[in-house]
Amino acid sequence: VDPGTQVGPDRLVNTVAGFDLHGGDLIVVDFGTATTFDVVDHDGAYVGGVIAPGVNLSLEALHQAAAALPHVDISKPQRVVGTNTVACMQSGVFWGYMGLVREICARITAERDRPMTIVATGGPCPAVPAGRDVVRRLARRPDDARPDRDPRT
């Protein structure tokens, strides 16, 4: 990380917990207000990351910026091609974020030139099980980090 650069404490906590549970060569994806991607090397050092608008922020921005678009909650749409405004918005954001996660994780992995473990956390995280081919672990509950549980199973 560049000297003098600040990293949010939430991002550092995510990477420390991720490293403790899964070891290094890690990408932690946090679906919060912002969707962040934080990278930890094989020794546990924080490398850097990516910040993108969050899922809910994107939906809210559509609602705020376009008067005709309603407030919509994120959920996995039944189809990619929506047949009404709500379904179209959900599809655009849901599948758009699946693409965002896949592409950013693929590019980080290529840049690091080594296999990476990818874990996810955050509010809308349970809404993205379709991304299980990319995200290896979903840290949804505090008890996911129980010391008596082997995180690699």
Which residue stretches match the model-derived regions?
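A glycine-rich phosphate/pyrophosphate-binding beta-strand-loop-alpha-helix module
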Residues: 38
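Nucleotide/phosphate-binding catalytic cleft detector across ATP-hydrolyzing
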Residues: 1-27, 41-153
